[in-house]
Amino acid sequence: MGENHAEYDIAIIGTGPAGISAAINARIRNKSFILFGNADLSAKVERSHIISNYPALPEISGSELNRRFAAHLEQMDIEITSERITGVYNIGKYFMLLAGQKEYKADAVILATGAQTVNEIKGERELLGKGVSYCATCDGNFY
C-alpha cells in the first residue's frame, strides 16, 4: 500500500492491560500488528492506588504496573502508534481503519478500549485509595 496505507494481520486499539497483552501475544506469534493508543498507557491503571487482583502481582500500585507494562513493551520492541482511530469498517475479507488521512488494513481488529468512565466528582481523585474506591467487593476490607 502507499504512504497513507499500511497492512497488518492484526490492529489492536487500546493500551490498557488487554491491548498490551494482545500486542505481546501477537509479537510472540510472529504476527504483523499495529498497536494504537496512548504512549502513557492506561490512565485508569495509573490512577489505581493498589491493585490486588492481578495474577502474580499482589498488592501492586497502578503506577508501578504501568511502569512494568512499559518495560515489557520496550523489551519486546513493541511501538505504540498514537494516532486516533476514527472509524473501523468491515470490508468483507479485511477491516479498514481510518485515522485522519491514513488508512490501515487488518485481517483482524482487537478493540481493547476499556470501560467508559463517568465524570469525577469534586475531590474524587485526591481521595482515591483514602476512602474512594471503584470496587466494593475488592476494596471493602480496606474501609
At which residue positions do the language-model features occur?
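Short amphipathic alpha-helical segments
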Residues: A23-N25, R47, I121-R125
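N-terminal Rossmann-like FAD-binding beta1-loop-alpha1 element of flavoenzymes
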Residues: D9-I34
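Glycine-rich FAD pyrophosphate-binding loop
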Residues: I28-R47
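FAD-binding core/adjacent interface of flavoenzyme oxidoreductases
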Residues: M1-A11, I80-Y143
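Cofactor-binding loop segments of dinucleotide-utilizing enzymes, especially the Rossmann-like FAD-
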Residues: T15, N38, T137
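Residue-level detector of alpha-helix initiation sites
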Residues: G16-P17, D40, A115-Q116
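Glycine-rich, phosphate-binding/catalytic loops in enzymes
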Residues: R29-N30, I51-S52, E126-G129
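N-terminal Rossmann-like dinucleotide/flavin-binding domain of flavoprotein oxidoreductases
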Residues: E3, E46-E103
